[in-house]
UniProtKB/Swiss-Prot annotation:
One of its GO terms (biological process) is negative regulation of DNA-templated transcription. A zinc finger (unnamed) spans 3-34. Keywords: ATP-binding, DNA-binding, Metal-binding, Nucleotide-binding, Repressor, Transcription, Transcription regulation, Zinc, Zinc-finger. This is Transcriptional repressor NrdR. PROSITE patterns: ATP_CONE. It comes from the Bacteria. Residues 49-139 form the ATP-cone domain. Binds 1 zinc ion. Belongs to the NrdR family. Its cofactor is Zn(2+).
């Protein structure tokens, strides 16, 4: 593997660890030329279904987009990065288990809302209010009442 510091192609693996849930492998490598160390991660290369937008456009699934949306909803909420990553993993597992080539964006949105509801009720309401395009306070009230039950 190419060294990110000097570009040398000769590096050696000095340590290998499997993640707790066995989803990826972490490797510490050392460059043979500059002797600097760096970390790489290996995870299976999977093909997620394409996301079909409301207007019919098809876009590729992007983990970063889900992460950004969830982080926005969870801003200043007491939820750890690990909890968010686990929620995204569950969303991705569900997407893959569907066994389809395309998923409507509203289905993905529902999966995100389900995970947010488990993590933090305030974040769930924040996300749902934007996702469902609330237009008046009564829609907020209905959702908050639903969450309180």
């Amino acid at each position: 593997m190419k060294c990110p510091f000097c570009g040398n192609l000769e590096t050696q693996v000095v340590e290998t660890r499997v993640s707790e849930d066995a989803d990826f492998i972490r490797r510490r490598r050392q460059c043979g030329a500059c002797e600097k160390r760096f970390t790489t991660y290996e995870r299976p290369d999977v093909n997620f279904p394409a996301i079909v937008k409301k207007d019919g456009r098809r876009i590729e699934y992007k983990r970063g987009k889900i992460l950004g949306s969830m982080n926005l909803a969870l801003r200043k909420r007491p939820v750890s990065t690990e909890q968010i990553d686990s929620a995204i993993e569950r969303i991705e597992e569900k997407l893959l288990s569907l066994g389809v080539r395309e998923v409507p964006s509203n289905r993905l949105g529902e999966l995100v809302m389900r995970e947010l509801k488990k993590l933090d009720k305030v974040a769930y309401v924040r996300f749902a209010s934007v996702y469902r395009s609330f237009e008046d306070i009564d829609e907020f009230k209905t959702l908050v009442d639903e969450v309180r039950r």
